[in-house]
């Protein structure tokens, strides 16, 4: 399949560049091996901020009397529930990236890219399967194979 632009990596730089290229009328694809949105969205900044927000709420509850409030009973936390909430927030944002790419008619090609010649990428199955929060890859999507592009962005 031939593209005007192929972008290797669906992180914050890759997916934004892909959307803009598509908006400018270029046939665009993104090769992603693991999860759209990159490390920050899926495993770093966003999940960490969700955990910090839970800690902040816990701290407010511990100091409820400072606000003229009373909490009866023991205050505690559930680390599993905190993690589930954090992952859920990341998954929601991850699916938003997928929606934006689809809305802008950007093809997502699942796999690991290798540039084999100028203007040609070979995509192989990822060394490790996609991990949550990425939804399972639907049947019929682009993946393993050879792709040509006028421009390749890494």
Where are these regions (language model features)?
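Beta1/beta-strand and adjacent pyrophosphate-binding region of the FAD-binding site
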Residues: 1-11
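Glycine-rich flavin
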Residues: 2-3, 19-26, 31-154
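N-terminal Rossmann-fold NAD(P) dinucleotide-binding loop
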Residues: 14
